[in-house]
Amino acid sequence: RTCIPIPPVCF
């Protein structure tokens, strides 16, 4: 449920 821009990953 958390997304990070670099690298573009959501978990």
Curated annotation (Swiss-Prot):
Keyword Membrane: no
Listed transmembrane segments: none
Taxonomic superkingdom: Eukaryota
GO cellular component entries: extracellular region
Predominant cellular place of this UniProt entry's protein: secreted
Coiled coil spans: none
Localisation: Secreted
Tissues where the protein occurs: Expressed by the skin glands.
Keywords: Amphibian defense peptide, Disulfide bond, Secreted
Keyword Secreted: yes
GO biological process: defense response
Annotated disulfide bonds: 3-10
Assembly and interaction partners: Homodimer; the relevance of this is unclear as other tigerinins do not form dimers and a synthetic peptide remained a monomer.
Role of this protein: Stimulates insulin release from beta cells at a concentration of 1 uM and release of glucagon-like peptide 1 (GLP-1) from enteroendocrine cells at a concentration of 10 nM in vitro. Reduces secretion of interferon gamma from peritoneal cells in a mouse model. Has no inhibitory activity against Gram-positive bacterium B.megaterium Bm11 or Gram-negative bacterium E.coli ATCC 25922 at concentrations of up to 100 uM. Has no hemolytic activity against mouse erythrocytes.
Name of the protein this chain belongs to: Tigerinin-4O
Species annotation: Hoplobatrachus occipitalis
